[in-house]
Every structure is written in C-alpha cells, then in structure tokens.
Amino acid sequence: MEFTASPKPQLSSRANAFSIAALMSSGGPKEKEAAENTIKPLEQFVEKSSCAQPLGELTSLDAHAEFGGGGGSPSSSSLCTEPLIPTTPIIPSEEMAKIACSLETKELWDKFHELGTEMIITKSGRRMFPTIRVSFSGVDPESKYIVLMDIVPVDNKRYRYAYHRSSWLVAGKADPPLPARLYVHPDSPFTGEQLLKQMVSFEKVKLTNNELDQHGHIILNSMHKYQPRVHIIKKKDHTASLLNLKSEEFRTFIFPETVFTAVTAYQNQLITKLKIDSNPFAKGFRDSSRLTDIERESVESLIQKHSYARSPIRTYGEEDVLGEESQTTQSRGSAFTTSDNLSLSSWVSSSSSFPGFQHPQPLTALGTSTASIATPIPHPIQGSLPPYSRLGMPLTPSAIASSMQGSGPTFPSFHMPRYHHYFQQGPYAAIQGLRHSSAVMTPFV
C-alpha cells in the first residue's frame, strides 16, 4: 500500500510571519545583536595603557550616561602608542589633553600580571591587593579635579582555571552584567597642586559579588576578567554636586597590567604566595612553616617547653638529671629511661616488691633537677628509672622487654591536652583507673 504525502497548506503572509520557522530564523540575529549591545568587548581599550577614552562611550557606564561627554562610537585610532586623544565627536580641551597618569605600583602589578592576577570577592566586600595607586602630571594647580575609578569587563567570556596546565581557559559566555558603579575617591575634589604633590590611592575600594550591596562596593561576577580604569574630571565652579557632571571634561586612563580575574578563592597557588609575601597586612599567614630551619627549631622548642611546663604529668627533658649519682640524660620529647647495667629479670624482681605509690610533691618547672623532687620511697636501683608511658603509667614487662632491645626506647611523642577527661579526678587517680591488672606497680621518682 503506497502512501502519498499530502501537500502542505499554504499560509498567508501574515500567518507565515508568526510561524515557528520564521520566528527561529529571525531570533538568531536579534539575540546576537542584543548580546553585543549588552556586553561590548573591551579588548581594544586594554592593549595600550596610555590611550584615553571618553567616559560615556563604554556600555559599562550606561547607568551613569550623564557622566559622559558624548555617545559616539570609538574610532579606529583608539589603539595608539602615545597619549593621544582619539577622534571622537567631542574632543577634550588642550588642558585635559596635557594630563598624564602613571601607575605608582607598576613593578608589583607586573609581577602579578605575569602569573595572572586574581582578586577575591566576597559578600561583605574585599579590598584589592595590589592597590591602584596613581599620580598625575600636567594638571592646572589652580583648578579642581575629581578622581574616579571603575572596573569594567575585559570581554564577554567566563573562565575556569586548569590546574593541570596552570592557566586560565575559556569556560563559556559571560554571566549577565551586574550594575555598573563608579567609585569616587573620598578626598575629591582635589586641587591641581595637591595632585602634583601626592599620589592618589584607591586602597578603600572593595569588591563584592552581592548584587544587593548597599555599601557602594563594586559588584563583580566570579571567574570573569576585569579591567580597572581611572578617570579624572575637571570640576567647574558652577558644579554643585558630583551628581551633575554632564558637561564636565574628563580623561580615562587604562593600565593593562592591572587586569585581573575575580574569584571567590585563589586558584593559582603562586598568586597566594606572592600576595602573602608582598602584602604587609598578611603577616598572620606567615606561620612557622614559612620560617627557616633555625627559626622553626626555636619556635618548636618554645612550644615544647610551654607544653611541658604546663603538663599535669611531669615529663623529663634532656636537662633533667635522674638522680644525684646518675649521669643519664634524656632526649627532648621523651619520658622514657632505660638501665644499661641491669638485666630485665632483676629489674622485674626488684620492682615487684615496691609498695603502692604515694602522691609526690607538686610539679616543678622544666629544667629543675629531680634531686629537688621529694620521693617518699627511694628507688633501690641508682642510675635507672622505670619506663613510663606518655600518660605516666608503668609499662608491662612485654613493653619493657621490647624497649630494652637496641640502643634505647623509640616511643613516639604526642602532645596531650592539658585537661583530659581522665585527669578530672587528678592525674594519679586516673592512672590507677587506666592501669592494667597485670601491670607492674612502681612509685614515681
């Protein structure tokens, strides 16, 4: 049985305009055009730091379009090697064209730029490091200027960090742009004389990923690349506030070495190390693991002395003498001593006749000779000390036999908490409760 395809019904021109095929064919160019109008790549503005761009030409400031001096598109002369003014509909005056801006911390920024600068963003806001610090020249000493800063996306891409390659890779299209904000330097307006004598530091700028931020922080998307920009505006005498700058003249300065990737946690470990080493406020991260061997040894010895001096059970160090006639010393961090001139059988037979131990005198500080510690029952064997475990418990004969073999005990040393739950009844009562029934009973010395 043969089937014949029925002819498709003919649609009118008006109905054909609303068909699925027509909507799909017309939707592509519109979406692409909308995306281009929403996020314009700023790669041409990043290549040269000495080029100036009018503030109102970039879509990152659409929300503050009144700050601009014109809405024309940037011309091909925006890529330049000298501080020239591009041929835009509104050309700044000769006074603004003479103004030059230099990045004070360029050497530090270059170090980060080689590795790929990353900036942390948080809900509450995080300050930038390195900080944007600039100085101006060519300004009129008698005029007043307003210095601003903003951060715009470099491109319309989202990035991810490839750990196996130690590099950033494109992960897809950028997230929807966040509200653009201008950061006005709190000391503005400056006089030209002030700008010639001092640098302008944006150390109080904070970056956040909180879209509902009400503190004036700059809102950024994580895993996106951004370019900070510095703007200088000449303030007219008739300007009452910073909100009315529609007719002001300005210049914009971009430094390509300040490009960074916004992250919620550092991806490159080299960036983390460089920030800790370069940031004077990161001293808290320079722990003992970053010290030299000599410094680390002194720190560890101080920690060890502190824990020993405050330990509820006295542990003997290498400075401790185990008896008036004994010359045996201990290595630091061990509470064990063995007798080299006494056999195991004679030691067990001698120790089995010891009565129950009594409470000794209070513990003394580290380094005090054991001769000053009163012993209620003197030990019959001079020059030796029964082995004790880390908790101060006498070891079993099997443990003693294993410790007597070789050059000496090699028991590991672990730091115990100062107030363990076993010591709530007193250290010696707790030891009695922990002692095995077959353990040898010996007094403390």
UniProtKB/Swiss-Prot annotation:
Entries under InterPro entries matching the protein: p53-like_TF_DNA-bd_sf (IPR008967), T-box_DNA-bd (IPR046360), T-box_sf (IPR036960), TF_T-box (IPR001699), TF_T-box_CS (IPR018186)
Location of this chain's protein in the cell: Nucleus
Keywords in alphabetical order: Developmental protein, DNA-binding, Nucleus, Transcription, Transcription regulation
Gene it is expressed from: Tbx20
PANTHER family from the UniProt entry: T-BOX PROTEIN-RELATED, T-BOX TRANSCRIPTION FACTOR TBX20
Major location category of this protein: nucleus
Annotated GO MF terms: DNA binding; DNA-binding transcription activator activity, RNA polymerase II-specific; DNA-binding transcription factor activity; DNA-binding transcription factor activity, RNA polymerase II-specific; RNA polymerase II cis-regulatory region sequence-specific DNA binding; RNA polymerase II transcription regulatory region sequence-specific DNA binding; RNA polymerase II-specific DNA-binding transcription factor binding
Ranges for region Disordered: 318-337
Comp. bias regions, Polar residues: 325-337
SMART domains: TBOX
Free-text tissue specificity from the UniProt record: Prominently expressed in the extraembryonic mesoderm, developing heart, eye analage and motor neurons of hindbrain and spinal cord. Expressed in extraembryonic tissues such as the amnion and allantois.
GO cellular component: cytoplasm; nucleoplasm; nucleus
Residue ranges the UniProt entry marks as DNA-binding: 108-287
One Pfam match: T-box
Summary of the function given for this chain in its UniProt record: Acts as a transcriptional activator and repressor required for cardiac development and may have key roles in the maintenance of functional and structural phenotypes in adult heart.
Deletion phenotype: Embryos die at mid-gestation. The heart tube of deficient mice does not elongate, but anterior and secondary heart field markers are not affected.
Name of the protein in its database record: T-box transcription factor TBX20
Gene Ontology annotations of biological process type: aortic valve development; aortic valve morphogenesis; atrial septum morphogenesis; atrioventricular canal development; atrioventricular valve development; blood circulation; branching involved in blood vessel morphogenesis; cardiac chamber formation
